[in-house]
Amino acid sequence: MSVCLIDKRRRGQQIPSVEMPNHTWFCVLDIDGMDTLIDTRHYCDTTTATPAKAKKMAALIENWTPPDGWCNGNDRDWHEKMKGYICDFLRKCNGFRVM
């Protein structure tokens, strides 16, 4: 299963979505402080965020060190790329919903 972060802009104006495995998203939800910004229950369809909260989430993720096995095994280079994709989306989106 996977999780897809979708920009809240109208269709045709949205930035590209970010899709990731459930485990990858659940680890993001478990970052300290994330619970003050969004619903961190491990259900894939409950989370939404405003643009301001999305930017705060990006700051938390940027300073976070993912656990081994986070995405693509223990490939630290890939971990940094995935963090970059997620943070870039969160900084540029007009808020998001999860599908």
In which residue ranges do the predicted regions lie?
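Acidic (Asp/Glu-rich) sequence patches and key acidic residues
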Residues: 1-99
